[in-house]
């Protein structure tokens, strides 16, 4: 696996997780 790909995947996951938490928690953090 490529390091750049891993980094991109991590950023994608973090972004998705953040969006999910915001949608679920309302105002959230």
Swiss-Prot record:
It is found in: Secreted. The modification Asparagine amide is found at residue 27. It comes from the Eukaryota. Its main location: secreted. One of its GO terms (molecular function) is toxin activity. Keywords: Amidation, Secreted, Signal, Toxin. Residues 1-15 form the signal peptide. Expressed by the venom secretory cell of the spine. The spine is a cuticular structure containing a single large nucleated venom-secreting cell at its base. It is an independent unit capable of producing, storing and injecting venom. On the back of D.vulnerans caterpillars, spines are grouped together by 50 to 100 to form scoli, of which there are eight in D.vulnerans. One of its GO terms (cellular component) is extracellular region. Belongs to the limacoditoxin-12 family. Probable toxin. Does not show insecticidal, antimicrobial and antiparasitic activities. Does not induce increase in intracellular calcium in mouse DRG neurons, suggesting that it does not induce pain. This is U-limacoditoxin(12)-Dv72. It comes from Doratifera vulnerans (Mottled cup moth).
């Amino acid at each position: 696996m490529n390091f750049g790909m891993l980094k991109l995947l991590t950023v994608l996951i973090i972004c998705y997780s953040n969006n999910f938490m915001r949608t679920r928690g309302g105002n959230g953090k």
